Amino acid sequence: MTTLMVQGTTSDAGKSTLVTALCRWLLRQGVAVVPFKPQNMALNSAVTADGGEIGRAQAVQAQACRLAPHTDMNPVLLKPNSDTGAQVIIHGRAVTSMNAVAYHDYKAIAMQAVLASHQRLSGEYPVVMVEGAGSPAEINLRAGDIANMGFAEAVDCPVILVADINRGGVFAHLVGTLELLSPTEQARVKGFVINRFRGDIALLQPGLDWLEQRTGKPVLGVLPYVTDLHLEAEDGIDVRQGAKDERVLKVIVPVLPRISNHTDFDPLRLHPQVDLQFIGPGQPIPPADLIILPGSKSVRGDLAQLRERGWDTAIARHLRYGGKLIGICGGLQMLGREVHDPLGLEGPAGSSPGLGLLDYATVLEAQKQLRNVAGALSLEQSPVAGYEIHAGVTQGPALQRPAVQLADGRSDGAISADGQILATYLHGLFEGSQSCAALLRWAGLADVQQIDYEALRERDIERLADLVEKHLDTAHLRKLCGVA
């Protein structure tokens, strides 16, 4: 059994992408490999086969390994629900919400969960490919660390350090990070990978030579800047779009402070007939064919922000002019009469009026609903698959016109009597080509092109493995992975 860890000099250095690439590259070599991230902080999560939730990056990495996502792949998930606090999820299940100080004291317990998951995976797979979090050199976070070197020291594994040259200062990032580590941690770093390089590699070579001489550690390769790679972002919203047809559907997503699972919109971003715009604070909602209210980790707080920004008025105007509106998960809850949080699960206990566009109310309960589901959209009876991650129980007359009939016999969500508003708890409803096409036709797009989002994701994972083969020292990587 071998464990290899990828750490980064900064957030968004390329850790998730590199782990995904290495997982598929190893799989091509006939090696059974499994992804692992000790601790993740993200509002994008995926439902696992064992009924829990993990970070979506680990779900993509599982796909790279051709494995079903499992809670052991990300034993600790932190989902921020305020500027200073987060919901703590252990082995896929919400334990409690804590502020940063309380979680610091809780880390020893969290580490036990991390090590238990790693032990199970390492007993089943010959290679465990680990992703760190942020940077290992955050001085204020090093005590009790479970996400980076604290984990590497505990399981005695080698580390690859990756840095993003596109940001500038790559040599300072690498050398500075190394200098801030302890001697034993420095010894764990077996090499560097430089990510997102553009230009002539010959011009970079003197710097690479200096880095190897300065640190005594090898540069394992330089990965190029790739502009059209479309894998799900771990947390930041990806606003890139490809070339669009002239006849497009204009779709607006208001970005709320605690937006969650915004990867729901990746298929729309890639669709050639959709002009997807994320609207932030201070921006008015422009004329559009479709507005989508996304998921939220703090529904009442985000409702207050929506009103403060005047977006409730803009949504009402949009509907008066015949536009379509979708609410997903937290967005579904916002569309109703009221949202009640008697236990204070997402902030101070209390109730808030919803937008009042659909006749139902939601009560947030401690037991979270986590399941992968399939069924048929009420629109065209198109097949749909997705997943539920929500603490709300929603009841009211509007649910008598459901948006989805689920294969397990339940119904989900609602469609307004005038057909303008659709609400659903299902994340991922745009990923299926037929369900996506049905929703786009409902929103007003004629002659919809069907795209195979799963095939696009698989194509990009294969491209990442190709980059490993072409640009990294695969012989050295095989040694680090214990592969002959």
Curated annotation (Swiss-Prot):
HAMAP family: CobQ. Pathway: Cofactor biosynthesis; adenosylcobalamin biosynthesis. It comes from Pseudomonas putida (strain W619). InterPro entries: Class_I_gatase-like, CobQ/CobB/MinD/ParA_Nub-bd_dom, CobQ_GATase1, CobQ_N, CobQ_synth, GATase_3, P-loop_NTPase. Gene3D superfamilies: 3.40.50.880, P-loop containing nucleotide triphosphate hydrolases (3.40.50.300). Residues 248-435 form the GATase cobBQ-type domain. Belongs to the CobB/CobQ family. CobQ subfamily. Keywords: Cobalamin biosynthesis, Glutamine amidotransferase. This is Cobyric acid synthase. The active site is at C329 (nucleophile), H427. The keyword Nucleotide-binding does not apply. GO terms for biological process: cobalamin biosynthetic process. GO terms for molecular function: ABC-type vitamin B12 transporter activity; catalytic activity. It comes from the Bacteria. Catalyzes amidations at positions B, D, E, and G on adenosylcobyrinic A,C-diamide. NH(2) groups are provided by glutamine, and one molecule of ATP is hydrogenolyzed for each amidation.
